[in-house]
């Protein structure tokens, strides 16, 4: 942006206008811009005739202002113009003058014939034909041309101050800021053409070049005259006697500041686009100026606050005016490095804007700054908030008064509501504190359990497993076993505890697996023949369809054994290989849960070995082979210990004729892996591997003891449903504390002794008091 301080030495009132060389754009046609089009050949230059395309001619016709506008604007030029600025003839012998035979062409001059001559300003034999320029005209010249201009003007200042201020009569008086108190008649210098009004309104007066009061200036020469710094410096030089003879002419900067800091001036005017121009402050920027002496003090009239406000008024319109473009001619030259903002729409066209990419955030910020509004996301409806908001407790409730459309509460009612609200909040806080303590206690127990598992893992790995056969029956190992096996050694301990009495090898597993795959391929072909021939139930249960159906229902919450899960194929392979290994047993519903627990803790081949040996145990073999007589013996033995430990609940079950087979079959078939949480079922498996089948029935008694009070309040249907689907919030500590309270001795007889006596009684046909056997 150009400010008043950038005018400098080039803002003289009556400078001699020198021609400005036309720009020579690279890669384009050389062309001198007309007087109405820009600075290509200086003000008043005429483009030499040449051919132009239709588009350029249309633009020129549209953009060229009226002839009278230029005449009125340049009517102030009264000094000698250099060649190339007009067609007026020059004195013979002068450079650029036409030959003597040529007739004068004063009628062709763009400045018109109304120019006034001032003989007192004749210098160098030149006859001036035009009046002086205004302050704004000289501001369009580059700095170097201004300095040459002032050197040429130095010879034309001997005529005195009054002669230099002469103006043609018949012009309008210019009243800029600060002219309110001037004389109504004014001096001749206060008259100018109507087009000078915007220029004179700038009232540019260099602050450090003002004349003190009484130094030969009249009242009409103060703000309205708008003298430049160069003219005032020359006036001081004349008053002092002028420069010494023989001394070289001083530069504009030296005459302006007396050798101090050079004045700022216009320089390097560039054309960027239509109706726009650019001013590069390469020469006027203070960071490029050489160091100078102390600044020239301001006059006394402008040192106070009133002078500062006057300077602000005088300089306020200068920058605003020069941002407008009075020369809309498009120039063909390279784009300047410095980009300018688009100019004003002066002659009907708007300059093209540069296609600058703006992000949505910048556009939103500009819109908000322009409109004063901020964009906020649309608020959600209150109905949706009411559905989504669910307070965790009554502490989220806020006590509010009644709406304004309802009668106000009385004092007693308001106090009662406040008291009730405080009680509700207090109860809610107590409940939350209790729950927080409970969660904290559970976390402490979990951390303690993890620490115990970590310490036990070291003992199992370093001491017990290397000496398994020696230490497995020791009291220390049995106590560690009861507390639960560390997950890292659980699979290994299970394999050692179950053993491999069947001597199954991984190679044997691969053989049975390949047979199972062949059987699955031929299953679709032989299924119809098997149905007609009447195959056994075991063969039908070993079919692929039954295995697939049971696998999809194995631990459905884990989503690892279903189709597409990581262990689906492994589980399918183990079950299929076992049906080929034991066709007499085949596949029974519930085997998938046992195989799945083994897969989670062992490798595929080791899981198959443990699975086959585990199902080969007497109790599992009797249940999976559906040996009804053996199953009744296990139920009778269970009832003996049931009556011994839970006599009250035993009588309650007996009153409803609730036999053990209703709830024990599912527990024994799946080894509690389906009825209990998985981590609790694994701990049951740990002790089952240590104690054998006895612990399975002891665990059943522990579950009945845990829910004894609840079961005593239920009838037959609800008891059966409850025991089939146990609660999920059961904890290992509570369950194992109830299991530990079960005594597996009846009249100094242990489980094995009681089971043997039951079998003997059945063989002898003796009377048996078991409700299951009676039925």
Swiss-Prot record:
Pfam family for this entry, one: RabGAP-TBC
Residues modified to N-acetylmethionine: 1
Question: At which residues is Phosphothreonine found?
Answer: 748
Q: Does the keyword Acetylation apply?
A: yes
Phosphoserine found at: 284, 315, 747
Location(s) in or outside the cell: Endosome
The keyword Nuclease appears for this protein: no
Top-level lineage group: Eukaryota
- Taking every annotated instance into account, which residue ranges of this chain make up the domain Rab-GAP TBC? 484-692
- GO molecular function terms listed in the Swiss-Prot or TrEMBL record: GTPase activator activity
Give coiled-coil spans as residue ranges. 409-452
| Gene Ontology terms describing biological process | regulation of autophagosome assembly
Checking InterPro entries in the record gives: Rab-GAP-TBC_dom, Rab-GAP_TBC_sf, Rab_GAP_TBC_domain
Which Gene3D superfamilies did the record assign? putative rabgap domain of human tbc1 domain family member 14 like domains, Ypt/Rab-GAP domain of gyp1p, domain 1, Ypt/Rab-GAP domain of gyp1p, domain 3
Q: Where is this region: Disordered?
A: 1-66, 94-312
Q: Where is the composition biased (Low complexity)?
A: 212-230
Instruction: Name the SUPFAM superfamilies on file.
Output: Ypt/Rab-GAP domain of gyp1p
Q: GO CC terms for this protein?
A: autophagosome; recycling endosome
Composition bias, Polar residues: 270-283
Self-association and partners: Interacts with RAB11A; this interaction recruits TBC1D12 to RAB11A-positive recycling endosomes.
Q: What does this protein do?
A: RAB11A-binding protein that plays a role in neurite outgrowth.
Q: What is this protein called?
A: TBC1 domain family member 12
Gene source species? Homo sapiens
**Gene of origin?**
TBC1D12
């Amino acid at each position: 942006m150009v400010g008043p301080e950038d005018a400098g030495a080039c803002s003289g009132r009556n400078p001699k206008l020198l021609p400005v060389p036309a720009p020579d754009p690279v890669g384009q046609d050389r062309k001198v811009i007309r007087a109405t089009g820009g600075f290509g050949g200086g003000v008043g230059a005429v483009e030499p005739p040449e051919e132009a395309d239709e588009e350029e001619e249309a633009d020129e016709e549209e953009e060229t202002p009226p002839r009278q506008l230029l005449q009125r604007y340049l009517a102030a030029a009264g000094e000698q113009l250099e060649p190339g600025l007009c067609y007026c003839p020059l004195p013979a012998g002068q450079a650029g003058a036409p030959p003597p035979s040529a007739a004068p062409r004063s009628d062709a001059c763009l400045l018109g014939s109304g120019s006034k001559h001032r003989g007192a300003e004749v210098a160098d034999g030149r006859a001036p034909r035009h009046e002086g320029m205004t302050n704004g005209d000289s501001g369009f010249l580059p700095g170097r041309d201004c300095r040459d201009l002032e050197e040429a003007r130095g010879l034309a200042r001997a005529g005195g101050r009054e002669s230099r201020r002469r103006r043609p009569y018949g012009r309008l008086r210019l009243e800029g800021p600060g002219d309110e108190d001037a004389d109504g008649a004014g001096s001749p210098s206060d008259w100018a053409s109507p087009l000078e009004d915007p220029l004179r309104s700038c009232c540019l007066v260099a602050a450090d070049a003002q004349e003190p009061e009484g130094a030969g200036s009249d009242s009409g020469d103060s703000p309205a005259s708008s003298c430049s710094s160069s003219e005032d410096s020359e006036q001081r030089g004349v008053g002092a006697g002028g420069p010494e003879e023989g001394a070289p002419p001083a530069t504009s900067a030296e005459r302006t500041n007396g050798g101090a800091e050079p004045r700022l001036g216009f320089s390097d005017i560039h054309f960027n686009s239509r109706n726009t121009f650019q001013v590069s402050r390469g020469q006027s920027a203070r960071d490029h100026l050489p160091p100078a002496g102390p600044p020239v003090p301001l006059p006394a009239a402008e040192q106070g606050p009133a002078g500062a406000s006057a300077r602000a008024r005088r300089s306020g319109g200068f920058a605003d005016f020069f941002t407008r473009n009075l020369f809309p001619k498009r120039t063909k030259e390279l784009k300047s490095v410095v980009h300018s903002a688009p100019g004003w729409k002066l002659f009907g066209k708007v300059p093209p804007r540069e296609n600058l990419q703006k992000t949505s955030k910048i556009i939103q910020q500009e819109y908000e700054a322009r409109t004063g509004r901020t964009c906020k996301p649309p608020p959600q409806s209150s109905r949706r908030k009411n559905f989504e908001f669910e307070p965790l407790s009554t502490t989220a409730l806020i006590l509010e008064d009644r709406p304004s459309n309802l009668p106000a509460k009385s004092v007693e009612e308001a106090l009662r509501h406040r008291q009730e609200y405080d009680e509700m909040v207090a109860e809610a806080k107590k409940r939350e504190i209790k729950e927080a303590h409970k969660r904290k206690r559970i976390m402490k127990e979990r951390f303690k359990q993890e620490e115990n598992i970590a310490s036990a893992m070291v003992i199992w790995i370093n001491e017990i497993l290397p000496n398994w056969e020696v230490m497995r029956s020791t009291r220390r190992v049995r106590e560690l076993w009861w507390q639960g096996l560390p997950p890292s050694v659980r699979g290994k301990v299970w394999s050692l505890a179950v053993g491999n009495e069947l001597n199954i090898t991984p190679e044997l597993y691969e053989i049975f697996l390949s047979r199972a795959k062949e059987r699955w391929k031929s299953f679709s072909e032989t299924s119809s023949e098997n149905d007609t021939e009447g195959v056994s139930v075991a063969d039908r249960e070993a079919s692929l369809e039954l295995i697939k159906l049971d696998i999809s229902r194995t631990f459905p919450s884990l989503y690892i054994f279903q189709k597409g899960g990581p262990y689906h194929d492994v589980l399918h392979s183990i079950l299929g290989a076992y049906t080929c290994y034991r066709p007499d047993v085949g596949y029974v519903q519930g085997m998938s849960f046992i195989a799945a627990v083994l897969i989670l803790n062992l490798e595929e081949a080791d899981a198959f070995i443990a699975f086959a040996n585990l199902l080969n145990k007497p109790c599992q073999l009797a249940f999976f082979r559906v040996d009804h007589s053996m199953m009744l013996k296990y139920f009778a033995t269970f009832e003996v210990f049931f009556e011994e430990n839970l006599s009250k609940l035993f009588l309650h079950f007996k009153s409803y004729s609730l036999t053990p087979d209703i709830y024990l079959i599912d527990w024994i078939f799946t080894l509690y892996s389906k009825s209990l949480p998985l981590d609790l079922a694994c701990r049951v498996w740990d002790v089952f591997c240590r104690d054998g089948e006895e612990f399975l029935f002891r665990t059943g008694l522990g579950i009945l003891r845990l829910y004894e009070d609840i079961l005593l309040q239920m009838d037959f249907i609800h008891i059966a449903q409850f025991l089939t689907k146990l609660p999920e919030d059961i904890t290992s500590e509570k369950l194992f504390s109830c299991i530990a309270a079960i005594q597996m001795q009846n009249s100094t007889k242990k489980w094995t002794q009681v089971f043997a006596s039951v079998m003997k009684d059945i063989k002898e046909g003796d009377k048996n008091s078991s409700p299951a056997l009676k039925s």
